[in-house]
């Protein structure tokens, strides 16, 4: 079957933003204008197409990033038809994993900002993730119709807070309730959308006289940014010659693709203004799969490999999300980087080294799906019923195996014990948690060996609430959850040398004998977390027992001597020991190593580390004193505040253990007018009194 849309006309984009910037509404409008959905879904009615899990519609926030395909030929039908694959990503920090994962498979992103709130804390996290994966982006300043809307302030914040070179493509005509349309700075025309048909049609008009001077100035700024793409254009610009519309767009595109410029559009998705022009900007400035460098990977023999975005290369794709669908079971979302695959074909999972058969392939439109027969380079689709595929696995042609880069997933910071309400649900709960952990790598499940309880861990209270909620809805398992537990860590502060561990049982028959001498030393928290250095000379311990020593120590790291928390940031140097020809074994050396480690750890000034969160509170000025007072009681280190007339932003670092229930307390202190966000920042040494209490509690 021939390709219906040439790959140069594909745009794989993510829409990402802070929680209330109106991102899902923007996605809904995209589906409406591109003709996919015939009735606009409103988030505040709980009818949005992209938010299809029940909890999302109740809470009005986006949890799983739905992938949708849409087609667009421009506001004035000025382009051949382009295919836009939109991935709607969550804006809540507890779901950062979803954002990280979708950034990995996107080619470009639209960053949505609220014209009132501007660049908010989560925007910074998302921006850093986009930088990490070198994703070219444009910005859309939404909610221009809201009281306090200020377009140019947001343009400035993108520069100062995010370090992005923001260049407006448009200026708003009016603001707040007087917002009527935008001026297209390249064409120097005002665009007015028709309210009667929900903005489906529009007219170009002259720029309002009172805005001419300002528009000229910003147009000059835009043309200069474009001209910097090449010497030739710079000369033309400085000679005072006009650049054509075509030259401006081509040059800007070049600078967006290299990450040098962020074009900024504005509008009000809710009022049906501006989204159409933003879609044009997606086509004008964001990359096709062929505009970005070939994806890199590792060939079967360990050498570096790559795949170009072409149908002629061997098939390669990355599974970036596993979702459970009530009707068809497992859905594996994947992005095709190269080649072609048909439903019914067998592919190779190079990470798990297993074959998988692509039974049915579907293209998702939010939660509606169309079955398709084949997918090609650049496509995003979902496969039904793959047996053993995890997030981040590579699915590729059997005859040309490659492992595309794995994604890195954050370590959970909070844990709670969960138990089913009835004994009968025990097995169902295990099954449900296993399924949910497969979907979400930032969520972990394990059984506490001492208490036998099931412990679930995740990225925050909201994350775990939603997991428990999904168990109830999707798997019909009612569960009780315990008090949240913080994931502490243990480490050492000083170096100790020449600590020995000896395991010897030699009373008749085959004995056991292992003897090691180690040094233990602290490592930089930014480093690898653990290192093992073998400096045995002259065969005092035979080579085959060295891995057993390393293993013996690594097993101790899982549950530290202080309070049973994971041990981090230390190194071990094995430099002496002895063995017995008959009685030595791997097990004996493993036990000797663990004895040496425990003895050394106790002498090396062990400390407890607690997770510190980066907290940002936004509050009306009247409550600043109360908020800071309360943060101080929570052992916060307040790093500063920024204020404008409506809101004060307070930045602080606070131990996670002090943040439980903060949402409720903050609400009551500020009559519900303040909001906050937090994300894991680092681990730091817990004060002696706190550490003592934690260690004591673990002994009970």
UniProtKB/Swiss-Prot annotation:
tr-type G domain sequence ranges: 8-290
Residues that, per the record, bind GTP: 17-24, 88-92, 142-145
Database matches in InterPro entries: EFG_II, EFG_III, EFG_III/V, EFG_IV, EFG_V, EFG_V-like, EFTu-like_2, G_TR_CS
Subcellular location: Cytoplasm
Any one GO cellular component localisation term in the record: cytoplasm
Keywords (A to Z) from UniProt: Cytoplasm, Elongation factor, GTP-binding, Nucleotide-binding, Protein biosynthesis
GO annotation (BP), single: ribosome disassembly
GO molecular function terms listed in the Swiss-Prot or TrEMBL record: GTP binding; GTPase activity; guanosine tetraphosphate binding; translation elongation factor activity
Superkingdom of origin organism: Bacteria
Gene3D superfamilies linked: 3.30.230.10, 3.30.70.240, Elongation Factor G (Translational Gtpase), domain 3, P-loop containing nucleotide triphosphate hydrolases, Translation factors
Primary subcellular site in the record, as a coarse category: cytoplasm
CDD domains in the cross-refs: EF-G, EFG_III, EFG_mtEFG1_IV, EFG_mtEFG_C, EFG_mtEFG_II
Membership in a protein family: Belongs to the TRAFAC class translation factor GTPase superfamily. Classic translation factor GTPase family. EF-G/EF-2 subfamily.
Function: Catalyzes the GTP-dependent ribosomal translocation step during translation elongation. During this step, the ribosome changes from the pre-translocational (PRE) to the post-translocational (POST) state as the newly formed A-site-bound peptidyl-tRNA and P-site-bound deacylated tRNA move to the P and E sites, respectively. Catalyzes the coordinated movement of the two tRNA molecules, the mRNA and conformational changes in the ribosome.
Protein name (Swiss-Prot/TrEMBL): Elongation factor G
Organism lineage string: Bacteria, Pseudomonadati, Pseudomonadota, Gammaproteobacteria, Pasteurellales
């Amino acid at each position: 079957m021939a390709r219906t849309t040439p790959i140069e006309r594909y745009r794989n984009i993510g829409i990402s933003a802070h929680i209330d910037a109106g991102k899902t509404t923007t996605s809904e409008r995209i589906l409406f204008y591109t003709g996919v959905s015939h009735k606009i879904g409103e988030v505040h009615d709980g009818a949005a197409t992209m938010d299809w899990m029940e909890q999302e519609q109740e809470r009005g926030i986006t949890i799983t990033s739905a992938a949708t395909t849409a087609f667009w030929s421009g506001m004035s039908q000025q382009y051949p038809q382009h295919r836009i694959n939109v991935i709607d990503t969550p804006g809540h920090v507890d779901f950062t994993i979803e954002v990280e994962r979708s950034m990995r498979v996107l080619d470009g992103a639209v960053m949505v900002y609220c014209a009132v709130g501007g660049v908010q804390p989560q925007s910074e996290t998302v921006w850093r993730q986009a930088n990490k994966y070198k994703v070219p982006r444009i910005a859309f300043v939404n909610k221009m119709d809201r009281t306090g809307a200020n377009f140019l302030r947001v343009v400035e914040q993108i520069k100062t807070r995010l370090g992005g070179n923001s260049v407006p493509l448009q200026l708003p005509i009016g603001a707040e309730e007087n917002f009527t349309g935008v001026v297209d700075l390249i064409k120097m025309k005002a665009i007015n959308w028709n309210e009667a048909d929900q903005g489906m049609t529009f007219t170009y008009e002259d720029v309002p006289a009172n805005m001419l001077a300002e528009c000229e100035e910003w147009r000059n700024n835009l043309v200069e940014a474009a001209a910097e793409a090449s010497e030739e254009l710079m000369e033309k610009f400085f000679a005072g010659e006009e650049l054509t519309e075509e030259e401006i767009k081509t040059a800007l595109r070049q600078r967006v693709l290299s990450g040098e410029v962020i074009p900024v559009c504005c509008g009000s998705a809710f009022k049906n203004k501006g989204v159409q022009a933003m879609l044009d900007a997606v086509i004008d400035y964001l990359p096709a799969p062929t505009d970005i460098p070939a994806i890199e990977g590792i060939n079967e023999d360990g050498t570096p490999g790559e795949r170009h975005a072409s149908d002629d290369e061997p098939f390669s794709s990355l599974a970036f999300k596993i979702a459970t669908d009530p009707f068809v079971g497992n859905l594996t979302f994947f992005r095709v980087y190269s080649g072609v695959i048909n439903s019914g074909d067998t592919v190779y999972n190079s990470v798990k080294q297993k074959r998988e058969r692509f039974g049915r392939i579907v293209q998702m439109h939010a939660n509606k799906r169309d079955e398709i027969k084949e997918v090609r380079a650049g496509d995003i689709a979902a496969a039904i019923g793959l047996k053993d595929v995890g997030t981040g696995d590579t699915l590729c042609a059997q005859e040309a195996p490659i492992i595309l880069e794995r994604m890195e997933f954050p370590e959970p910071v909070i844990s709670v014990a969960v138990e089913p309400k009835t004994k009968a649900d025990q097995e169902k709960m295990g099954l449900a948690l296993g399924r949910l952990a497969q979907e979400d790598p930032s969520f972990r499940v394990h059984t506490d060996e001492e208490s036998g309880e099931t412990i679930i861990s995740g990225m925050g209270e909201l994350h775990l609430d939603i997991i428990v909620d999904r168990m109830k809805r999707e798997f019909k398992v009612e569960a009780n959850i315990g008090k949240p537990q913080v994931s502490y860590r243990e480490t050492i502060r000083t170096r100790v040398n020449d600590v020995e561990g000896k395991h010897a049982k030699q009373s008749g028959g085959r004995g056991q004998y292992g003897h090691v001498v180690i040094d233990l030393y602290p490592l930089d928290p930014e480093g690898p977390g653990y290192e093992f250095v073998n400096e045995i000379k002259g065969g005092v311990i035979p080579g085959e027992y060295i891995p057993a020593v390393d293993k013996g120590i690594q097993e101790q790291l899982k549950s530290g001597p202080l309070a049973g928390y994971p041990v981090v940031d230390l190194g071990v140097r094995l430099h002496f020991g002895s063995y017995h020809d008959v009685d030595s074994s791997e097990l004996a050396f493993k036990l000797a190593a663990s004895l040496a480690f425990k003895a050394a750890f106790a002498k090396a000034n062990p400390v407890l580390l607690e997770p510190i969160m980066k907290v940002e509170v936004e509050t009306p000025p009247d409550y600043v004193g109360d908020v800071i007072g309360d943060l101080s009681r929570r052992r916060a280190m307040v790093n500063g505040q920024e204020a404008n007339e409506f809101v004060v932003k307070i930045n602080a670092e606070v131990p996670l253990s002090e943040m439980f229930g903060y949402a409720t307390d903050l609400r009551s202190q500020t009559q519900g007018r303040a909001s906050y966000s937090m994300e894991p920042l680092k681990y730091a040494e817990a004060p002696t009194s706190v550490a003592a209490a934690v260690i004591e509690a673990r002994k009970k």
